[in-house]
């Protein structure tokens, strides 16, 4: 196998792995709406606000940070990285409201048209764009 064919094959494998990670991340981040609704209803959560706020605690954040050197070459990486960090601020704020018993305010912050909904949608769109570009 020539070097160029081998390199192309290696690149395809890497792209397939990135696609899998993106798919997992979209699913995992989608679960946060469920977790937040649960926290609002119960006024408790297994997650601490500061843990939720920190982007490198979740699987996507761990992957984005651990593979940064190899992922920087992708134009969509920086956008996803930045949006991901911003997205973590909103669930932390909502979690804080939920744990403080501010159910109506927390529910509103989670609803359609909220910062959480908009940032989540932008992050998902950016990840899908990245996946399609591979």
Identify the role of each PLM range.
Residues 1-134:
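N-terminal membrane-sensor/transducer module of prokaryotic signaling receptors
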């Amino acid at each position: 196998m020539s070097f160029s064919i081998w390199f192309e094959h290696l690149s395809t494998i890497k792209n397939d792995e990135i696609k899998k990670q993106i798919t997992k991340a979209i699913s995992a981040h989608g679960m946060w709406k469920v977790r937040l609704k649960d926290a609002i209803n119960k006024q408790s959560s297994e997650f601490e606000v500061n843990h939720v706020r920190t982007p490198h605690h979740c699987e996507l954040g761990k992957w984005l940070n651990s593979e940064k050197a190899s992922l920087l070459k992708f134009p969509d990486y920086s956008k996803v990285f930045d949006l991901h960090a911003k997205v973590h601020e909103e669930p932390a704020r909502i979690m804080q409201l939920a744990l403080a018993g501010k159910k109506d305010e927390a529910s509103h912050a989670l609803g359609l048209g909220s910062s959480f909904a908009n940032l989540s949608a932008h992050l998902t769109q950016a990840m899908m764009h990245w996946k399609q570009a591979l």
